[in-house]
Amino acid sequence: MRSEIRICGGENVRALKMAVHAVRYKENLYMNRLEKIPVPAIATFLALLTLSNVYGGLGFVWFRYLCMACGTVFIICYILKIILFPKTVMNEYSQVIPCSLYAALTMCMMILGSFYLEIGTNFGIPVLGIIGKIVWFIAVAVHAVHLVRFIALNMFLKRNVMTTMPSWFVTLNGIMVACVTGGAMNARPLLVVLTIYGCLIYVIMLPIMIWRLLTVEIKPAAYHTMAILLAPCSLCVVSLINVFGTPNALVVGFMYLCAVCSLVFIIIKLPDFFSFKFYPGYAGLTFPMAIGIVASQKMAGYLTEAGSGLAACVGQLAGLQIFLTSGLVFYVLVMLSRMLFKKSDRG
């Protein structure tokens, strides 16, 4: 009888140890995946949130809500990564290109903040609206600090043509997402300043970036950052129209012309972009294309008000952009998920 009890007791102890081991294994697995979330994944979710706003404007609000929920979960996970793995994050942040892409985190927070303010207002949930507003202002402030540090470090203290890449625009012009999303924040003076700053920094940096791309070879790991050229001019178009209503026709026309040229460049380069085996840098294709849609939609509305016959053409171009961008964002999201969850190819 005692021997049977000992045997049963031993089996229970072994089973308990195995259960504890399994739990610890899962915890370590989840922590490992959390730590290894690549920085470009932030830009991909930024594109998803932007694209969901486009679909929301077309009437697909459920899809928008789903994307905003997924984006919220992702941002929380990434903030946990920053808190739990500061050494990993600082190592990423110390490298110029990943550092420039970290600005996408605050850009996501601006979009989410404006969304929750909208939801809180529409559904009569004041607390949610207040939270949204706080998140938005914190995101703008953090982005501003990051921007000042980035400019001081990479434009004045250290200058390296090899690390001067279009990804810089994520930091330099990314703060203009505040102008895209901040209409309900009662912060017009701030938005005016950001719009003027964004247009000026784009005009200053564009020839530098073009010269760099034409004269210095781009390494494969940064190849897809070339597509980011579409983002700053698109942000300028949207910001000018959002903030000023009827901006100077020459200024907004120039910015949109730059956006169209950048879009054509991306479309021509698509075969080259997809000649690479997938890696997180593919995310460089996503947000620029998504904000490019918003720029075309805003420009179509601007031209309609001006009575221009080009409005219909620009509106149709936006349709093509929605098609291309949806495919690109979906592809990058799926492939990033496969990398994160280590799904191998099947023969």
Located regions from the model:
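Hydrophobic, membrane-facing alpha-helical anchors
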Residues: 18, 25-30, 76-90, 139-156, ...
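A structural motif
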Residues: 46-74, 110, 121, 136, ...
